[in-house]
């Protein structure tokens, strides 16, 4: 099957048969200074390792477990920070939207707008995102089977947008738990669209800490290596210099100081797997 190539700025290409792209950053913008510092570290490490890179952060976490949880600085301030990061480091950027009115202004600043998993079946939001003409990253809902992603793809296509990336972030497995279906990611690859793996959110234990999500940070490397062995278009991760005190999803975040060691392993797995000849076992 032909593999679709998504072309971003800086000659970054996202495709299942290309070297993997890192979609990395922080969960939510906590401050301008912290965002700049984290972005700088990612840029230094990815340039050293020769890994194509897209910066990620959220300006609003609209689906927190508790009404009292930190959500972020909001769209206006968030876009100002994104513009500064983009102009300073000259990297493509991705962030998520939650409401129709956010789509157009966000698409003017970032390269990729992300459809959150919980909202992936909201047709009006899908259409508004599609009409921006931006590249779209679709988070697979925890409650959908991999083959059902074709319906979401069709919605974007019918609205005039074919620049789609699919992202696996785990599937619900009973209460307060997620599992990753490796064969499901391969099934999504059969669409021809690039598939990336959100290896940090897949470590979540939703609602695992009563009023916020828990996580399994200690298994971050094992899960990511397993996903990369499928030969994916990209890896999606979030890191923090002090995960235990991060304002959102700290239990899933990779400690920032481990980024280089972590990515060195992921690149090695990606290069090895993509050096293999494809074996068609269906015949």
Swiss-Prot record:
Keywords: Cytoplasm, Lipopolysaccharide biosynthesis, Transferase. It catalyses: D-arabinose 5-phosphate + phosphoenolpyruvate + H2O = 3-deoxy-alpha-D-manno-2-octulosonate-8-phosphate + phosphate. Transmembrane segments: none annotated. InterPro entries: Aldolase_TIM, DAHP1/KDSA, KDO8P_synthase. One of its GO terms (molecular function) is 3-deoxy-8-phosphooctulonate synthase activity. SUPFAM superfamilies: Aldolase. GO terms for cellular component: cytoplasm. GO terms for biological process: keto-3-deoxy-D-manno-octulosonic acid biosynthetic process. It is an enzyme of class 2 (transferase). Its EC number is 2.5.1.55. Pathway: Carbohydrate biosynthesis; 3-deoxy-D-manno-octulosonate biosynthesis; 3-deoxy-D-manno-octulosonate from D-ribulose 5-phosphate: step 2/3; Bacterial outer membrane biogenesis; lipopolysaccharide biosynthesis. It is found in: Cytoplasm. Belongs to the KdsA family. This is 2-dehydro-3-deoxyphosphooctonate aldolase. It comes from Shewanella frigidimarina (strain NCIMB 400). The gene is kdsA.
């Amino acid at each position: 099957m032909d593999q679709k190539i998504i072309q971003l700025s800086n000659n970054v290409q996202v495709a299942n048969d290309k070297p993997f792209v890192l979609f990395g950053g922080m969960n939510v913008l906590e401050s301008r200074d912290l965002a700049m510092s984290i972005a700088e570290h990612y840029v230094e490490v990815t340039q050293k390792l020769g890994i194509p890179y897209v910066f990620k952060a959220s300006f609003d976490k609209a689906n927190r477990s508790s009404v009292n949880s930190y959500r972020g600085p909001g769209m206006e301030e968030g876009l100002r920070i994104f513009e500064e990061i983009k102009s300073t480091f000259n990297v493509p950027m991705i962030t998520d939207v939650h409401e129709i009115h956010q789509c157009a202004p966000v698409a003017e600043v970032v390269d990729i707008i992300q459809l959150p998993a919980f909202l992936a079946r909201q047709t009006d939001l899908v259409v508004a995102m599609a009409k921006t003409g931006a590249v779209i990253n679709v988070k697979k809902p925890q409650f959908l089977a991999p083959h059902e992603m074709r319906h979401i793809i069709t919605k974007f296509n019918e609205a005039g947008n074919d620049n789609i990336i699919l992202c696996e972030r785990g599937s619900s497995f009973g209460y307060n738990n997620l599992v990753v279906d490796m064969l499901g990611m391969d099934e999504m690859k059969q669409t021809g669209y690039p598939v990336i793996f959100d290896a940090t959110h897949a470590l979540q234990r939703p609602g695992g800490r009563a009023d916020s999500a828990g996580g399994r940070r200690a298994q971050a490397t094992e899960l990511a290596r397993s996903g990369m062995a499928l030969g994916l278009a990209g890896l999606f991760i979030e890191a923090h210099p002090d995960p235990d005190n991060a304002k959102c999803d700290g239990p899933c975040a990779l400690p920032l100081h481990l980024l280089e060691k972590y990515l060195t392993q992921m690149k090695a797995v990606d290069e090895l797997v993509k050096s293999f000849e494809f074996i068609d076992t269906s015949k």
